[in-house]
Design a protein with these regions (language model features):
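Terminal connector regions
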Residues: 108-175
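Membrane-proximal alpha-helical anchors
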Residues: 1-102, 183-184, 188-191
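Surface-exposed beta-strand edges and their flanking turn/coil or helix-capping segments
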Residues: 50-52, 67, 76-79, 136-138, ...
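Generic alpha-helical propensity signal that fires on short helical segments
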Residues: 38, 68-72, 80-82, 133, ...
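Acidic, serine/threonine- and proline-rich intrinsically disordered appendage/tail regions
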Residues: 79-92, 149, 155-191
Length: 191
C-alpha cells in the first residue's frame, strides 16, 4: 500500500511539473511580440508617400530597447542625416521664407517605445511634392540598400535581436536571435 501511495505521489509530482512547464510556454507564446520593418511608397489614396514603419506583427506588446538604421553599411542617427547622405536632401528651417513651399520630412523615433500587437510606428515619412522629386526618387531607390537592427523584449523580459530589411525574403528575418538583454548600440537611430 505504501509503495502504491509513493507511486501515485511520484506521478502526481511529474504531472504537476509538466503542467507548470506547459503553462509557462503558453503564457510566453501568448505574449510573443514580433517586429518587422515595412516600407511603402504610396498611401491608401494612391498618393506617392514614402513611409518607413516598424510594425509589431506578433501577439504581445514589444518594448523596443534599441533601433539602428544602416545605409550602405553605415549607421545613421536621424532621417535628416540619412537623406542628406543618400539623396542630397537639404533641411529647411520652419522660419525661412522657402518653408511655405517646402515638402516637410516627417520624423519619428522607435527606440524606447512600447508597440502593442498590431501597432505600427512611423520613423520616416516623406510625401512627393512639387519641390522634391529628385530627393524623393533617390530615397525610393536608396531604401533597397537600407538595413535595420532592432532589439526588443516581451512583457516577460524575453528579448530578441533582429537584422531586418523591408523585403521579407531577407535571410533570417523570420528568425530573430533570442538574447539575454539588448545591447546598447554605439550609433542609435533617434529621429
Amino acid at each position: 500500500m505504501a509503495v502504491a501511495a509513493l507511486f501515485v505521489s511520484a506521478i502526481s509530482l511529474w504531472v504537476a511539473i509538466r503542467t507548470e512547464q506547459a503553462n509557462e510556454e503558453l503564457v510566453a507564446a501568448s505574449t510573443w511580440p514580433f517586429l518587422q520593418v515595412q516600407v511603402s511608397n504610396a498611401d491608401p489614396d494612391a498618393k506617392l508617400d514614402l513611409q518607413f514603419q516598424v510594425v509589431n506583427t506578433g501577439v504581445g506588446p514589444a518594448k523596443v530597447e534599441s533601433f539602428e538604421l544602416f545605409w550602405k553599411g553605415k549607421p545613421y542617427t536621424s532621417s535628416a542625416t540619412l537623406l542628406a547622405a543618400c539623396c542630397s536632401y537639404r533641411e529647411v528651417k520652419a522660419t525661412s521664407p522657402e518653408a511655405k513651399s517646402h515638402t516637410p520630412l516627417l520624423k519619428g523615433t522607435v527606440q524606447g517605445i512600447v508597440l502593442r500587437a498590431g501597432e505600427a510606428e512611423t520613423f520616416i515619412r516623406y510625401r512627393l511634392g512639387d519641390d522634391n522629386l529628385a530627393v524623393w526618387s533617390a530615397l525610393d531607390k536608396a531604401r533597397e540598400q537600407m538595413r535595420y537592427r532592432i532589439c526588443y523584449c516581451s512583457v516577460l523580459d524575453q528579448c530578441w535581436k533582429s537584422e531586418l530589411q523591408a523585403e521579407l525574403y531577407f535571410r533570417g528575418q523570420l528568425h530573430p536571435e533570442e538574447v539575454k538583454s539588448c545591447p546598447i548600440p554605439s550609433v542609435a537611430y533617434i529621429k
